[in-house]
Swiss-Prot record:
Catalyses which reaction(s): CO + 2 oxidized [2Fe-2S]-[ferredoxin] + H2O = 2 reduced [2Fe-2S]-[ferredoxin] + CO2 + 2 H(+)
NCBIfam families according to UniProt: CO_DH_cata (TIGR01702)
Residues at which [4Fe-4S] cluster 2 binds: C53, C56, C61, C73
Cofactor binding remark: Binds 3 [4Fe-4S] clusters per homodimer. Binds 2 [Ni-4Fe-5S] clusters per homodimer.
Binding site for [4Fe-4S] cluster 1: C44
Family under the similarity heading: Belongs to the Ni-containing carbon monoxide dehydrogenase family.
UniProt free text on domains: Cluster B is an all-cysteinyl-liganded 4Fe-4S cluster; cluster C is a mixed Ni-Fe-S cluster which is the active site of CO oxidation. Cluster D is also an all-cysteinyl-liganded 4Fe-4S cluster that bridges the two subunits of the CODH dimer.
GO BP annotations, alphabetical order: generation of precursor metabolites and energy; response to hydrogen peroxide
Principal EC category: oxidoreductase
Protein name: Carbon monoxide dehydrogenase 2
Length: 634
């Protein structure tokens, strides 16, 4: 297989050869076995077009818009495609909110002094509570408890009762437009019920109605789930601030006990770092024959952690995104893989057996065939649970290398991570004016929020994302990166000071003056909400310029799963030009395609652009940014 069909990253390319030599199932070979993209392509053309449905016993049905061929119930291809998209959106929103629910649970128990965590950012707690209209005259614990009560009450509002969180946090112009469209949301639970119920057979088959419900759900998700989640995690674990972090597979050293918290929830990861930094745990590891004990960040759980806590010899580094997972597990450097919500592959038990590591589900969402033992996260028991996990890892080290050699000599780079609204303001001297001045002068043409996964659909891991971002910064467009795509940028070296050499002259000069890279590591996919709040602040700083008129865009060069689809729908509701790749499974729905790629501009101000070529994709983004600059007279 061609190296670039595997991955952009040399480390993963090399590990693929090891995995092949070991005759292990892997994501690349499984992709090829599906016949996807082959000649001929063996995918079902109706499935690829989104023109099929199997929700009821009359089906499976296929539809063809060119012949007005409908499902047995009478639903059109447009309705089929959008209904399935809305169901994906519900899955994405639900999973985002599961994380939020666990964060609020953790904050409440921390306020009651029942967890190993603390309120690390009392000022952030007060600032956020004050924005929500919560009394901040009491103790930090009282404020935190009142905050938990306030947001949970809002989450549980019925869909017909407007969300207070959205009312308070969203930009005024956006709220007005959402009210006009009838998509101002209620509570997130009510919105998920409304959306899911709408997808029942013979309920809502109208693609426009379904699309508006998707936007409504996306708005509720972004403000209630994402913003509340990230800001409350800031309160508990720290506001992201810039610092360097080791990245890539070279952070794995087989002579250490290596623990990998993996998924999207950082709670047990942070608890393990706190314990592992204590001398007694290092001594336990050394008594087992290791040089020490390390916690290695992985995927989005790791991204949440590295944004907030600095590296040392215990919290040692970050591996990469989800397609790197089998490469990491096959390294024979892992002792414990703690799998929380999201992004732990179903084949992990096969890798655990082959490469001698302990696989432990730590979320009630996660299960693996053949793995009966589990340790579901409980904030009150978090320290005890973390200790059990570290003990498992130390015990595993004794036998890890009994049946094979570890992979050695992999590269490790450095990335600057930890950008947030607060840290950007700090870098700018406490005001957005320097950034706005750079945009007004043209030194920075515009800003792109890159919220992406990684996928093998058209290219190897991260190949397309890196190509798009390199092209953006070459054209003096600043990038804020989030999600698995953020890991792509970090490991590819684009979040380092040296990446300024890829930037256009004026962006390079701004980055040098501010001491930042041209790609700002802005967090996880959940930080989409944080980005929306930043755009609201920029809109306000410019005197209320509508978000659709800002020289900004969203990009998902390698979206993959259901969370990504709700992020994209929210971006459209927010009024953003939104670039996505691969081609979504809606091409058999011509009216829906027209709605998303043309008519949406008149509805919300947003627009979906789909393009598989990196240069053409950036051409579209740049053209949009230049049009907005012209409209603003800058």
């Amino acid at each position: 297989m061609d190296k670039e069909r595997i991955s952009y990253h040399e480390s993963v390319q090399k590990m693929y050869e090891r995995i092949k030599a070991d005759n292990m199932t892997n994501v690349w070979d499984r992709y090829e076995a599906q016949g996807i993209g082959g000649v001929p392509d063996r995918r079902c053309t109706f499935c690829m077009a989104g023109a099929r449905c199997d929700l009821c016993s009359n089906g499976p049905c296929r539809s063809d818009a060119s012949k007005d061929k409908r499902g047995v119930c009478g639903i059109t291809a447009d309705g089929m495609a959008m209904r399935m998209m809305l169901l994906r959106n519900v899955m994405g929103a639900s999973t985002y909110h599961y994380h939020t629910d666990q964060t609020i649970r953790t904050l409440r128990e921390t306020a009651r002094n029942k967890t190993p965590y603390s309120i690390r950012e009392p000022e952030k707690l007060k600032t956020f509570a004050n924005r929500l209209g919560i009394d901040i005259s009491g103790s930090d614990a009282e404020i935190a408890l009142n905050l938990c009560e306030f947001v949970e009450k809002d989450f549980n509002r019925p869909a017909y009762e407007p969300s207070r969180i959205v009312e308070i946090l969203a930009p005024p112009e956006r709220k007005k437009r959402w009210e006009e469209l009838g998509i101002f949301p209620g509570g997130i639970y009510g919105e998920m019920m409304l959306s899911t119920s709408s997808c029942l057979t013979n309920v809502d088959g109208y693609y426009v109605s379904l699309a508006l419900k998707a936007m409504r759900l996306g708005i509720a998700m972004a403000y209630q789930s994402q913003i509340v989640n990230e800001y409350c995690q800031d309160v508990l674990f720290g506001i992201p601030r810039p610092h360097t972090m080791r990245v890539d597979l070279g952070v794995l050293d087989p002579e250490y006990v290596n623990v990998l918290p993996n998924g999207h929830e950082p709670f047990l990861g942070f608890a393990m770092v706190q314990l592992a930094r204590k001398p007694e745990w290092q001594e336990k590891a050394k008594a087992a024959g290791a040089k020490g004990l390390r916690v290695i960040a992985s995927i989005e759980t790791g991204q949440e952690m590295i944004q907030r806590w600095e590296e040392d010899d215990v919290f040692y580094g970050f591996t990469g995104n989800w397609i790197s997972q089998e490469a990491v597990l096959a390294s024979r450097c892992v002792d414990l893989f703690a799998a929380d919500m999201n992004c732990s592959l179903p084949v992990a038990p096969l890798y655990a057996e082959k490469y001698n590591f302990k696989l432990m589900p730590v979320s009630d969402l996660v299960a693996f065939e053949g793995i009966e033992e589990r340790l579901n996260y409980d904030p009150v028991e978090a320290e005890e649970q973390a200790a059990k996990l570290l003990d498992m890892a130390v015990e595993n080290f004794k036998n890890r290398n009994s049946s094979g050699e570890a992979a050695l000599n992999f590269p490790a780079g450095e990335a600057v991570v930890g950008f947030s609204t607060e840290s950007i303001l700090d870098a700018l001297g406490g005001t957005l004016d320097p950034l706005l001045d750079a945009i007004k002068s043209g030194a920075i043409k515009g800003v792109v929020g890159m919220v992406s996964c990684t996928t093998l659909r058209d290219y190897g891991q991260d190949v397309h994302s890196v190509a798009v971002v390199k092209e953006l910064i070459k054209r003096n467009i600043l990038v804020l990166s989030m999600g698995c795509g953020n890991a792509a940028m970090q490991v590819a070296g684009l979040c380092s000071p040296e990446a300024r050499e890829y930037a256009g002259d004026s962006l390079k000069a701004v980055c040098e003056a501010l001491g930042v890279p041209p790609v700002l590591s802005y967090g996880t996919c959940t930080d989409t909400g944080r980005l929306a709040d930043l755009l609201g602040a920029i809109s306000g700083a410019l005197g209320g310029v509508p978000v659709p008129d800002l020289p900004v865009a969203a990009a998902a060069p390698e979206y993959m799963e259901q969370k990504a689809t709700i992020d994209a729908i929210f971006a459209l509701a927010l009024g953003l030009y939104t670039y996505v790749n691969p081609v979504p499974t809606v091409t058999g729905a011509p009216n829906l395609v027209k709605l998303l790629t043309e008519d949406c501009r008149e509805v919300t101000g947003g627009l979906l652009n789909v393009e598989t070529d990196a240069v053409k994709a950036v051409d579209g983004i740049e053209q949009h940014i230049m049009e907005k600059r012209k409209k603003l007279g800058i």
